[in-house]
From Swiss-Prot:
Domain called KilA-N: residue spans: 21-131
Reactions catalysed: S-ubiquitinyl-[E2 ubiquitin-conjugating enzyme]-L-cysteine + [acceptor protein]-L-lysine = [E2 ubiquitin-conjugating enzyme]-L-cysteine + N(6)-ubiquitinyl-[acceptor protein]-L-lysine
Protein name, per record: Host range factor p28
Keywords: Host cytoplasm, Host-virus interaction, Metal-binding, Modulation of host cell apoptosis by virus, Modulation of host ubiquitin pathway by viral E3 ligase, Modulation of host ubiquitin pathway by virus, Transferase, Ubl conjugation pathway, Zinc, Zinc-finger
High-level lineage: Viruses, Varidnaviria, Bamfordvirae, Nucleocytoviricota, Pokkesviricetes
Keyword Metal-binding found: yes
Domain of life: Viruses
Protein's organism: Monkeypox virus
Entry domain remark: The RING-type zinc finger domain is required for E3 ligase activity.
Free-text function comment from the UniProt entry: RING-finger E3 ubiquitin ligase which catalyzes the formation of both 'Lys-48'- and 'Lys-63'-linked polyubiquitin chains. Plays an important role in virulence by acting as an anti-apoptotic factor.
């Protein structure tokens, strides 16, 4: 049985997208909840809603040697901490349609999907995930030029952001010398990018520098190379992503 996108109903609750695949003639109903995490630019899929047994099996699997090794390698390859490869939404009245264990899509496609014994459900799940990613990553469009990105391009884009995150998490501010991603306050864990050079600063330090220069009547120069800048861009990465 082939996957048919026409049979997908899409809705959302808060930051969760809910995909319902309904094929009544074949008595197939599958609900997939997906979170797109903007902090590490990836997707997390609710395996509890697919089948509660999958969540229990996953928790047991990741405690075994094979599971631990896979999680370690995935964390290294994506630059995402192991603890951030999964997310949980609590079961309460507000979250009754979206609660459960969400895991990195790589774990679903390459590990969990093999635990599903129904090959038709396997095929539909894979189709739903690929369909969602393909339809939620687009190139900029103009009225006369509508272009969607291929699945291969999507993977390249995700890899690009993951590489950017991996490099960014090691960068230190050139003023306070702290690792930007390790600063105590969450609002400080951003870079302040200058339009004049590539020196690295956290957003807090460079804003204080900029404000002090303005108050004293001094020119807006980079604290390191003294090149004049016109603007500061707040960014989660150490440089702008094209």
């Amino acid at each position: 049985m082939e996957f048919d996108p026409v049979k997908i109903n899409t809705s959302s609750i808060d930051h969760v997208t809910i995909l319902q695949y309904i094929d009544e003639p074949n008595d197939i109903r599958l609900t997939v909840c997906i979170i797109r995490n903007v902090n590490n630019i990836t997707y997390y899929i609710n395996i509890t809603k697919i089948n509660p047994h999958l969540a229990n099996r996953f928790r047991a699997w990741k405690k075994r040697i094979a599971g631990r090794d896979y999680m370690t390698n995935l964390s290294r390859d994506t630059g995402i901490q192991q603890s951030k490869l999964t997310e949980t939404i609590r079961n309460c009245q507000k979250n009754k349609n979206i609660y459960g264990l969400y895991i990195h899509y790589n774990l679903v496609i390459n590990v969990v999907i093999d635990w599903i014994t129904d090959v038709i459900v396997q095929s539909i799940l894979r189709g739903l995930v690929n369909w969602y990613i393909a339809n939620n990553t687009y190139t900029p469009n103009t009225p006369n030029n509508t272009t969607t990105i291929s699945e291969l391009d999507i993977i390249k884009i995700l890899d690009k952001y993951e590489d950017m995150y991996r490099v960014s998490k090691e960068k230190e501010c050139g003023i306070c010398y702290e690792v930007v991603y390790s600063k105590r306050l969450e609002n400080d864990r951003y870079f302040g990018l200058l339009d004049s050079c590539n020196h690295i600063f956290c957003i807090t330090c460079i804003n204080i520098w900029h404000r002090t220069r303005r108050e004293t009547g001094a020119s807006d120069n980079c604290p390191i190379c003294r090149t004049r800048f016109k603007k500061i861009t707040m960014s989660k990465f150490y440089k702008l992503v094209n």
